Design a protein with these regions (language model features):
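Bacterial Sec-dependent N-terminal signal peptides
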Residues: 1-22
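N-terminal module-boundary/linker segments of secreted carbohydrate-active enzymes
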Residues: 21-46, 50, 55
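Structural recognition of the beta-strand scaffold that forms the well-ordered cores
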Residues: 26, 30-36, 65-71, 109-114, ...
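Aromatic-lined carbohydrate-binding/catalytic grooves of carbohydrate-active enzymes
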Residues: 52, 56-155
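Glycan-recognition surfaces
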Residues: 133, 177-278
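Catalytic cores of secreted or luminal carbohydrate-active enzymes
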Residues: 260-311
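Carbohydrate-binding surface patches
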Residues: 266-269, 274-276, 312-356
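C-terminal beta-strand-rich structural cap/linker in extracellular carbohydrate-active enzymes
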Residues: 379-394
Length: 394
């Protein structure tokens, strides 16, 4: 019998061209970084961003791969007499070029936010009608990443709007990762591969594991709800073009079990890992989750293939993700609030993956099992494996 290594996630405890394209070579693995919105919303300023930059270095997050520091909404001031956007002078008195220089001095990359509409979601000036000016300004400031939102766009075509900003970024000449935040309304996974480097597949995430935060005309979703919305999308993801199920809520008050499950599933999805917590005051448990090198390696695997849900039974879901070197990641998610016991009979998990064109073949192959949360090898797949999965955990 052929012996393969198998990683198992088992958790117990330029000039404008006529046919402009996005910048190739960026986001060859899912982008990793931090964004201000989930924790701070519009309450951001120059001092906060600098202290976050410091914390990304001092905590070890930068060296773990989290390199993008992204300002979300509400950094904007007004446009100058020529129409160029300026930073809010009260919040960012030194200006965006100086802030970008500070971020770059820390070995980080500078991310910024705008909106395809006339106003951002926070009521600041949007980029509509100023796309080329804004792209030039971002390039001048040294921006490396643009999140482009979709508020105030009632009469705007999303394909045209996002392609327009893509072309503007290309014309400005600085390689900028283009993160499309259209909330999945126009199914961007079907058309945006040549437009952006990542696209939101859903509305906003809400800081809960299993809930819907309903509002008139829109809703925000818990971890499980967003996970369910990824069904049928995996074939559209890959190096340079990722499905984005939104930023992480790890470290924002959910249980350790829920945080671990959240991080595990986003890693299995090959999703961008964009933190949304206050990294200046993380608990050790949060650090241990966010900086687990072996789980991050599943997310960052060079094949860039999104995981799939193979089966579900009694509140448990069984997920596989093909990895390089003929390895597989395997994860059992417990959606229920109570502990679940299960005996894994590997022969029942023979599957052929249409995306990777690979077969698990437990009948003729023996895989070594490695628990990525304990960082220990735990036998192989020759024998059945009894497991206990805590509620809302993996």
């Amino acid at each position: 019998m052929k012996k393969n290594t198998w990683i198992a996630v088992l958790l117990f405890c330029l000039p404008l061209a006529l046919n402009a394209q996005k910048f190739e070579g960026l986001a060859q693995t899912p982008p990793m970084g931090w964004n201000s919105w989930n924790k701070f919303a519009c309450n951001i300023d120059e001092n906060l961003i600098k202290t976050i930059a410091d914390a990304m270095v001092e905590s070890g997050l930068r060296d773990a791969g989290y390199v993008y520091l992204n300002l979300d909404d509400c950094w904007h001031g007004e446009r100058d007499s020529l129409g160029f956007i300026q930073a809010d002078p009260l919040k960012f008195p030194s200006g965006m070029k100086a802030l970008g220089d500070y971020i770059h001095s820390k070995g980080l990359k500078f991310g910024i936010y705008s909106d395809a509409g006339r106003k951002t979601c926070g009521g600041r000036p949007g980029s509509f009608g100023h796309e080329y000016q804004d792209a030039l300004q971002y390039a001048k400031w040294g921006v490396d990443y643009l999140k482009y939102d979709w508020c105030e766009t009632e009469d705007i075509n999303p394909v045209g709007a996002y392609n327009l900003m893509r072309d503007a970024l290309r014309a400005a000449g600085r390689p900028i990762l283009f993160s499309m935040c259209e909330w999945g309304h126009s199914k961007p996974w079907t058309w945006a591969k040549e437009t952006g480097h990542m696209w939101r597949t859903t509305g906003d995430i809400f800081n809960c594991f299993d809930c819907v935060d309903q509002h008139p005309g829109w809703a925000a979703y818990g971890v499980l709800q967003i996970l369910d919305m990824q069904n049928g999308l995996r074939q559209y993801a890959g190096p340079g073009h990722w499905n984005d199920p939104d930023m992480l809520e790890v470290g924002n008050g959910q249980s350790v079990n829920e945080d671990r499950a959240h991080f595990s599933m986003w890693s299995m999805l090959a999703a961008p890992l964009i933190l949304g917590n206050d990294i200046r005051s993380m608990s050790q448990q949060t650090k241990d989750i966010l900086m687990n090198k072996e789980v991050i390696a599943v997310n960052q695997d060079k094949l860039g293939i999104q995981g799939l849900k193979f089966a579900a039974e009694d509140g448990l879901e069984f997920w596989f993700k093909p990895l390089a070197d003929n390895d597989w990641a395997f994860c059992v998610l417990n959606r229920s609030t109570t502990d679940k016991q299960y005996v894994i009979d590997w022969q029942k998990f023979n599957l052929y993956d249409e995306v990777s064109k690979r077969f698990t073949d437990f009948d003729s192959k023996v895989y070594t099992i490695r628990n990525l949360w304990t960082n220990q090898n735990e036998g192989d797949t020759k024998k059945v494996r009894p497991v206990t999965i805590p509620g809302h955990d993996v």
